[in-house]
Design a protein with these regions (language model features):
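N-terminal signal-anchor transmembrane segment
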Residues: 1-52, 72-80, 373-377, 389
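Alpha-helical transmembrane segments of multi-pass inner-membrane proteins
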Residues: 118-145, 171-216, 221-233
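A membrane-periplasm/extracellular boundary helix in multi-pass inner-membrane enzymes
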Residues: 133-135, 235-273, 291
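Long extracytoplasmic/lumenal interhelical loops at the membrane interface
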Residues: 271-331, 353-354
Length: 411
């Protein structure tokens, strides 16, 4: 590995670690954007020096075509007066660019999947540790609710979704950011990595559950339960019968302590007036966006367009909870099929290429991750930007890793 390749790998590792930040920003410095730009430039140079440009172009016909059409749509939208079209296009394509480049870098052995998945684990542990520390400090009443909000704004430049919740007599704080999906989607694969001791894998499972509880998102809780159910099926027969019986007895006996508070939390998150209020916002957005789609159903209103008298964010006004519908508003039905369908096809084709060669539990985990990525934008902003796209990058890297290290994981 030459000096340029070594530098590239250092940038890749730092870039992955930067995903520990809620939005890749710290104290006003866009650390993640800087590292991603370096990654794209250095990765591009390394691939060109491989002298396999024609092979890459032939292999990436779909990606190149989709990129060209997106650039054309962006230019047309900007000419028609949509000043946000450039930002929208950047957010729409940035994760795809990193995804495709990392695919080729690993394929041509310019990047090492083993070290990449280690960096992903360290990054997720940092995210979990940060959430747990904030939770402990809040429970111990060393910090006020408003101070948590202020901390995220000043340190990370983002408005975290916060609320208080009760677990029995404990008053907890829920802190949710756009990148929380990364941990819930990718950590389950580490429960299956036999290079880690059973105690470590059990700890990672517990940390995943704690993290999901702190984030307190309905979607993430259901997703975690899907992964946990599959993991139990996978490991059930491997656990000695006596241990299984003792474990079940302990769970049932301890349910006297935890069952009622947990049920109360679930009722609050899924069926309370708080949940109803959140759903009402989506209903309003749906009505407004559907009316907008009817005005221009085929070609839409242009990249970066939005309903002028109804926005949820001043910095990205084209972003809505009902994200797929907002894409139809901007791109039209034709554009939605071409652009959103094209991006999903890129992700799915490359990930499935490697997933189909792995053991069944990795295949199922991959399908769960892909499924939730496809479903989530129907009711949450979960498609645009670096944070949302990283789960696809992670799924690709992890499946490539399992392919390379199949021996210990085969039946």
């Amino acid at each position: 590995m030459n000096k340029l390749s070594k530098l590239l790998n250092v940038v890749i590792y730092l870039c992955i670690i930067s995903y520990a930040l809620p939005t890749g920003v710290m104290m006003g410095i866009p650390i993640q954007k800087i590292l991603v730009c370096l990654l794209i430039i250095l990765g591009g140079i390394c691939l060109v020096l491989q002298r396999k440009s024609l092979e890459i172009i032939k292999s990436a016909k779909l990606e190149i075509t989709l990129g060209f059409l997106g650039l054309l749509a962006c230019i047309v939208s900007y000419i028609l007066g949509n000043e946000w079209s450039i930002k929208f296009t950047g957010l729409f394509y940035i994760s795809v660019i990193v995804f495709v480049e990392l695919y080729f870098l690993v394929r041509y052995e310019l990047a090492e999947p083993e070290k990449i998945i280690e960096c992903i684990l360290y990054m997720m542990l940092l995210k979990i540790l940060g959430k747990i520390i904030i939770e402990i400090v809040f429970v111990c009443k060393l910090i006020e609710y408003e101070a948590v909000i202020e901390f995220y704004l000043n340190m990370f430049g983002t408005e975290a979704s916060t609320m208080t919740m009760h677990l029995g007599r404990l008053l907890l704080i829920r802190v949710q950011t756009s990148s929380d999906i990364i941990v819930v989607t990718l950590m389950p694969f580490y429960w299956m990595m036999e290079k880690y001791k059973k105690s470590i894998r059990s700890l990672l499972f517990a940390l995943s559950g704690i993290y999901t509880l702190i984030v307190f998102s309905r979607v993430l809780m259901v997703e975690f339960c899907c992964f946990a159910f599959v993991a139990v099926l996978y490991y059930w027969k491997k656990i000695p019968k006596k241990v299984r019986c003792i474990g079940l007895i302990l769970v049932l006996a301890s349910s006297v302590l935890w069952l009622k508070p947990v049920i109360q939390m679930i009722e609050f998150r899924f069926f309370s007036s708080f949940a109803a209020e959140s759903d009402d916002v989506r209903q309003i957005q749906m009505r407004e966006l559907i009316n907008g789609v009817k005005e221009s159903p085929v070609f839409g209103h242009g990249f970066g367009s939005y309903i002028s008298d109804y926005t949820r964010s001043g910095s990205i006004p084209f972003s809505y909870e009902i994200e797929y519908l907002s894409f139809c508003y901007q791109m039209g039905i034709l554009g939605f099929v071409v652009f959103v369908g094209g991006v999903l096809l890129i992700y799915i084709r490359k990930i499935v290429k490697y997933a189909r060669k792995n053991i069944w539990v990795i295949k199922v985990f991959t399908l769960i991750g892909l499924g939730w990525f496809v479903i989530r934008p129907a009711f949450n902003p979960a498609f645009l930007g670096l944070q949302n796209g990283f789960q696809m990058i992670g799924l690709l890297m992890i499946n490539m890793y399992f392919n390379k290290k199949q021996e210990p994981y085969q039946k």
